Amino acid sequence: MEILMYKRLPPLNSLKSFESAARYLSFTKAADELCVTQAAVSHQIKLLEXFLGIDLFKRKNRSLELTELGKAYFVDINKILRRLNEATERLLTLKTDPHLNISVPQTFGIQWLVPHLSEFNQLYPQIEVRLTGVDQDEGLLNKEIDLAIYYGLGNWQNLQVDRLCEENLLILASPELLAENPIIQPEDLKKHTLIHIHTCDNWQAMANHLQLDDLNIQQGPLFSHTFMALQAAIHGQGIVLANRLLALQEIENGSLQAVLPTNLPDPKSFYVVNHLDRLDDQKIQAFRQWIINSIKQEENE
């Protein structure tokens, strides 16, 4: 870490008095804003000028002007004090309202976020996550929700949007089902019940990808949620086509196995999103950075 030396910093009260007086070009208005006397403002500015060894103001009768050096110094000090104020406000907000309200599609919450949430809690014990599952691809982002996970094409307007990952669709089956009826080549898919999620579209895309013109994609049960379809596959009710990220824990614990090197991209992806007026919210940005890095790390393993 870089070691910073603060030996030549002027007093904060002097900087505040200068910034306010320079903004108003008036000691009187600066005194009103800072709730002190005009004499106190004048004294603080004299201290600052003595510290810097330069004149910051030109005093002409009843008017006040900045010197050229004073103008340059004001621009920098104004920015610094604004950032100091914003940083303090963010910290106080975090202290008084530690909650982070997150909305996610139910399957993403069940399959990935909840199993990993303890990692975030260990890194940020001061932030209390409140998780809401929604029955739709796009998490619900409103005034009560700080941040959401969306599943889609990433074309949402007026939001901060970051893709979490680009995933392939995997053909998954239980080890028991594969032991009874192995899948060695694409033609073997015809011997199995197809499990669908929402629609038959993904199986149609896979059939086209594998050049299986006669695969009957209309047969087999259809589920509204991926976690239900994965459970059906675990219990040997057929083979399922699912996003790798959502099936990661089942693949890792061996309850489902991927068959055939499909390399078919999921046309949709998961995104972390929030409103543009929350770009400086430390809780939101901490969670965004954590989830992006966590998923990226899993991809590299």
Curated annotation (Swiss-Prot):
GO terms under cellular component: cytoplasm
Keywords: Cytoplasm, DNA-binding, Transcription, Transcription regulation
Domain of life according to the entry: Bacteria
Feature: DNA-binding region: 27-46
PROSITE patterns in alphabetical order: HTH_LYSR
One Pfam family cited in the UniProt record for this chain: LysR_substrate
Localization per record: Cytoplasm
Main location: cytoplasm
Gene Ontology terms for molecular function: DNA-binding transcription factor activity; sequence-specific DNA binding
Domain HTH lysR-type: 10-67
GO biological process, one term: DNA-templated transcription
Function: Not known, the gcv operon regulated by the E.coli homolog does not exist in H.influenzae, so it probably acts as a transcriptional regulator on some other operon.
Family: Belongs to the LysR transcriptional regulatory family.
Cited PANTHER family: GLYCINE CLEAVAGE SYSTEM TRANSCRIPTIONAL ACTIVATOR, HTH-TYPE TRANSCRIPTIONAL REGULATOR
Name of the protein: Glycine cleavage system transcriptional activator homolog
Species in which this protein is naturally found: Haemophilus influenzae (strain ATCC 51907 / DSM 11121 / KW20 / Rd)
